[in-house]
Amino acid sequence: MTLASPPQIKPLTDEELHKINAYWRAANYLSVGQIYLLDNPLLREPLNKEHVKPRLLGHWGTTPGLNFIYVHLNRIIKKYDQSMVYIAGPGHGGPGLVANTYLEGTYSEYYPNISQDAGGMQKLFKQFSFPGGIPSHVAPETPGSIHEGGELGYALVHAFGAAFDNPDLIVAAVVGDGEAETGALATSWHSNKFLNPASDGAVLPILHLNGYKIANPTVLARLSYEELESLFVGYGYKPYFVEGSDPALVHQQMAAILDTVIAEIHSIQREARVHGFSKRPQWPMIILRTPKGWTGPKEVDGKKTEDYWRSHQVPFGNVTGNPEHLKLLEEWLKSYKPEELFDANGKLIPELAELAPKGDRRMGDNPHANGGILLRDLVMPDFQNYAIEVPQPGRVMAEATQVTGKFLRDVMKLNLDSRNFRVFGPDETASNRINAVLDVTDRTWVAQKLPEDDHLDPSGRVMEILSETCCQGWLEGYLLTGRHGFFSCYEAFIHIIDSMFNQHAKWLKTTRHISWRRPVASLNYLLTSHVWRQDHNGFSHQDPGFIDHVVNKKSEIIRVYLPPDANTLLSVTDHCLRSRNYVNVIVAGKQPALQFLDMDAAVKHCTKGIGIWEWASNDQGSEPDVVMACAGDVPTLETLAAVDILRQHFPDLKVRVVNVVDLMTLQPKTEHPHGLNPKDFETIFTTDKPIIFAFHGYPWLIHRLTYRQPNHNNLHVRGYKEEGTTTTPFDMVVLNDLDRFHLVMDVIDRVPKLGYKAAYVKQQLQDKLIEHKHYISQHGEDMPDISDWQWPY
């Protein structure tokens, strides 16, 4: 038998075949009912237009295939007592997953009002894509779902993320042939190079070739067997083909192939667990080719519909206004013979109900799909033990991420036995200087190894692949199944997963309002190699805009932190690793930098999120003349250097220095739970004094966050304004008017009392900027009085 040939054996008895096909019919019937019906759920009376929804929404085309796979996986779960999670890549087939969780009983357990009778079925139908009801996709509201599948491309990475460190779990990942055309999905086939059969679970990819997308054929469906086989053998899989349109034949094929692949998976795992890991296995996968819109109308209004793109969404509309369409819908629904599937009360008949697994073996009730149930707190070292000694502010140098790397190393060490913490990054763990974690673990790697390879091992817990999308997807799958993780990335290139962040934030927002969904560990980003220290790589590597993107999401979900030094980064990192159901974004530098706060001060500052730095201010006992605010490590440095210049030239000027570590404190409390109420904002920023705000990112973000706060008219923000190149570190801030000299000139322009002396000081500052340009063009580095500056007070 070649890989492309289905087996000729028939593993199902006639009775088993009849029951499996009947169960599939029931799932298909419930799926069509959700799309079309408002009432008359069991067709106990002739269908009329009052029984049909006025707006028909949903996707039929992929749904019968999803239902077909589900019933066959149920058989496997029962036969092998296998723990299994179902990921529907084509998540627009939401009716199918809702139907199957209803048939197995889990849906009614989570939603008792959707009961196992005719009344419950009517509610099930009505609620789908209906105001006040449920969404059309495999959304968080769907029991058993960890993957909505609305934005395509992430089925496999979520599946592998779920399988890591879950040795008893098989994740069935259905990949739609449309989804298979996305870049994210194309790369995620390589996840098999990171799956350790000795300690991880397994992923069973099921590539569903139904041939069409919304209005076009799919690429993979038009490849020959030989090309498909070569493609997936090249990816490292052993593909098995199942295909056809005759349900009886395809049921037998699918049952036989599933028996084969499950036996292979168990054999691979048994070999690795008994004898140890020896080489990367060739994991099996299934390529299932069935008609799009299978069992639906073959034609509508004389046009081909089944096995064609016209069945993708609602195969036909205008049911209430077209008697022929109403008749067609009734015939379609009756073709499933619901009277044979449901009893007089509308409940699935017992001989079919027994096909579903029991308890938490049901895929809708598998605890891995509600990961908060399994979540255990990390064992955490005391972050204060890693403190940098700061006897005086602005004198000691340290690398913030390197210090935090030692803390993460010990987080990893303390949780090695629990196997519930991993670090993720696109080949940047060393570059971002958190590579101390490699003192206690290695990079995960099950592909070929060479003698000179460094820190590569199948049991490693640092996940590195040069794909931000894979890292993000693995981490999401890992978190949603009840574990913890940490993702470090270059700041500019985290934009690659902007849309993935969107989807995860939406998932978290929705789950907060679903009582049975338990909180999961937060998704924690460390963004470093940031805009102000990418002077060596140039303009392409300079973009602080991810935080602009993040703050668009619901305040109950997102947190943004800009720790100015190593001790504050330690405090923030500890806080984020302990948190639940958030997306935490930390932006911090990796280069040697001045340290400002000892650990006690850092903890207090991070707890408040914003505060006046008394040691840097000289307005005690009086009103300040100007507020110098800053957020971010480099803006903090430039602000303090500017304050030094102001003190030298204007010793009578009263300056208040405010540092922001929790960016969301700037919003009003009505907008974000961390926000300041207007009175507290006035206390810090005054009611009428100029505020010069040096910000890490794009200036208008500060204006957005504070526009409802008092004294906004006096707020002047400096930040990144899309000026950059390969240059020196200080020249980067000069190019964007964020340097100490421009900040002082901003004060001069906004504090009238400085009088005649201001003109001379301003001219001196302009001369310094000219001197700077000449110096770097001649020497290729910053002037010593810039690079060697320290806080002198």
From Swiss-Prot:
State any single GO MF term: aldehyde-lyase activity
User: Would the keyword Lyase turn up in this protein's UniProt record?
Assistant: yes
**EC id:** 4.1.2.-
| Cofactor(s) required, per the database record | thiamine diphosphate
* Keyword annotations of the record: Lyase, Thiamine pyrophosphate
Q: Does the keyword Lyase apply?
A: yes
Family annotation (InterPro entries): Phosphoketolase, THDP-binding, Transketo_C/PFOR_II, Xul5P/Fru6P_PKetolase, Xul5P/Fru6P_PKetolase_C, Xul5P/Fru6P_PKetolase_CS, Xul5P/Fru6P_PKetolase_N, Xul5P/Fru6P_PKetolase_ThDP_BS
Which Pfam families does the entry link to? XFP, XFP_C, XFP_N
Tell me the protein family, please: Belongs to the XFP family.
Protein's name according to its UniProt entry: Probable phosphoketolase 2
